[in-house]
């Protein structure tokens, strides 16, 4: 596995691959790998000739006061994981290489970015879309792989690829969970023992909504109220950022569950901001 820090060097390599008919897969990450990241790399490895994993804690997607400086990092450990997973390249640029002095070009998807996480984190998806567009232009992938835990991010990036006619397929991989149901996340290390004990209730609340739909309930206000009541009892230290039932593609809130519907939520628990989602049908 090559470790590359220069955008220009990466682009030259990937352009040679593309001209030679090589199928490249891109796995964008911010590092501090867990089994969820490994599942993305394994998915890419099975479907491409070459796999590029990017490891970049992207400052453009952090708002002032967020955890950019505190975000967990372990470059040597992550390199071992990426190599073991079969990555051909680990791309680890410095911020000044991706955003040199005078950088002033941004990619925004206003509609899909406005609700859910976008409402609470202004500018977040502008940073995500911009860095992913740059990574795609550097690597020229046929396939890009993301986790479904960040469902809104997946929907936004698919819209970007469609609107810009990018010759890339964007695939989502299922959420990888701890044995108690908590979605794996690099930020879970922020949780205290007591917060970690409560954290699985986020997912259990979503399961309650799914079970109610299976039992015939269709009113999303009733479903959301039931989830909030469950959290009140089992996640008392959590502070809800949002809880919505939306169409999985448009992310528009639904009044009734009549077809495809996803329950998406974000809860702050101590220093951690936990997100999760679950298809209700």
Swiss-Prot record:
Catalytic positions are: 37
Keywords tagged on the record: ATP-binding, Cytoplasm, Ligase, Nucleotide-binding, Pantothenate biosynthesis
- Residues recorded as binding (R)-pantoate, renumbered to this chain, are 61, 153
Q: Please give the catalytic activity noted in the UniProt record.
A: (R)-pantoate + beta-alanine + ATP = (R)-pantothenate + AMP + diphosphate + H(+)
Which leading EC class covers this enzyme? Answer: ligase
Pathway assigned to this chain's UniProt record? Cofactor biosynthesis; (R)-pantothenate biosynthesis; (R)-pantothenate from (R)-pantoate and beta-alanine: step 1/1
Keyword DNA-binding listed: no
Under Enzyme Commission nomenclature, its number is 6.3.2.1
**Location of this chain's protein in the cell:** Cytoplasm
Q: Does the keyword DNA repair apply?
A: no
Which GO cellular component term is one of those annotated? cytosol
User: Which residues of this UniProt protein bind beta-alanine?
Assistant: 61
Query: A biological process (GO) annotation for this entry?
Result: pantothenate biosynthetic process
Molecular function (Gene Ontology), one example = ATP binding
Query: Mind telling me which Pfam families this protein's record contains?
Result: Pantoate_ligase
Binding residues for ATP: 30-37, 147-150, 176, 184-187
Q: What else is known?
A: The reaction proceeds by a bi uni uni bi ping pong mechanism.
Q: How does it assemble?
A: Homodimer.
In the record, the note on similarity to other proteins reads: Belongs to the pantothenate synthetase family.
Q: What does this protein do?
A: Catalyzes the condensation of pantoate with beta-alanine in an ATP-dependent reaction via a pantoyl-adenylate intermediate.
Q: Which PANTHER family match?
A: CYTIDYLATE KINASE/PANTOATE-BETA-ALANINE LIGASE (PTHR21299), PANTOATE--BETA-ALANINE LIGASE (PTHR21299:SF1)
Q: What is this protein called?
A: Pantothenate synthetase
The species this protein belongs to is: Oleidesulfovibrio alaskensis (strain ATCC BAA-1058 / DSM 17464 / G20) (Desulfovibrio alaskensis)
């Amino acid at each position: 596995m090559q470790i590359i820090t220069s955008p220009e060097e990466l682009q030259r390599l990937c352009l040679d691959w593309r001209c030679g008919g090589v199928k490249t897969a891109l796995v964008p990450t911010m590092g501090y790998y867990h089994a969820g990241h490994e599942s993305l790399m394994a998915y890419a490895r099975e479907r491409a000739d070459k796999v590029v994993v990017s490891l970049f804690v992207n400052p453009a997607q952090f708002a002032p006061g967020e955890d950019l400086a505190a975000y967990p990092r372990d470059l040597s450990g992550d390199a071992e994981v990426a190599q073991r997973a079969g990555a051909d390249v680990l791309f680890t640029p410095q911020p000044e290489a991706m955003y040199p002095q005078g950088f002033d070009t941004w990619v925004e998807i206003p509609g899909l970015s406005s609700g859910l996480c976008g409402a609470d984190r202004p500018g977040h998806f502008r940073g995500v879309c911009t860095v992913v567009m740059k990574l795609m232009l550097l690597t020229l992938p046929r396939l890009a792989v993301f986790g479904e835990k960040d469902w809104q991010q997946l929907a936004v990036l698919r819209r970007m690829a469609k609107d810009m006619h990018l010759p890339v397929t964007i695939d989502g991989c299922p959420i990888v969970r701890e044995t108690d149901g908590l979605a794996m996340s690099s930020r879970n290390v922020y949780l205290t023992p007591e917060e970690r004990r409560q954290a699985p209730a986020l997912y259990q609340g979503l399961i309650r909504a799914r079970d109610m739909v299976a039992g015939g309930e269709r009113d999303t206000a009733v479903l959301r109220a039931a989830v909030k009541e469950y959290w009140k009892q089992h996640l008392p230290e959590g502070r809800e950022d949002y809880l919505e039932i939306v169409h999985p593609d448009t992310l528009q809130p639904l009044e009734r569950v009549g077809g495809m519907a996803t329950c998406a939520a974000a809860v702050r628990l101590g220093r951690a901001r936990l997100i999760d989602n679950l298809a209700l049908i």
